[in-house]
Amino acid sequence: MKWVHIGEEIKYDWYELRCQLSQENHLQIFLEDLKNQNLKYCIDFGKILFCRFIDEGWDLNLLEEDLLSGPEFPNLSDGILLEMKDTHLKNRVQKFYPAPIYHYQVQGINFGIDVLTEAFPIIKKI
């Protein structure tokens, strides 16, 4: 498994995450900086295929067995929005889904979230 920091426009800090998922599977994640109340962002994933919440830490991401043996663990300071490459989760879904998909992970201070989607997320400062 590899990862790439793609949320460069999101200034690094400690963000609390809030999620809004519609009945049509449209996912928006709102980030609010716990120290600097002026830093607020929305990551709009559009219609997603799958999402799951990760509670406090990579060791609880059970579908990514190779995380524990890999040389490099992404930390909160490595990026808030990451594109995950060659993951077990993405590979399992891709076997049954004909279109190309992307695996993203958003890391917050209260939890993290895995997202599978066909689209690139849109980041808005609010």
Predicted features by range, described:
Residues M1-I126:
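Surface-exposed, interaction-prone regions used to assemble/regulate multi-protein complexes
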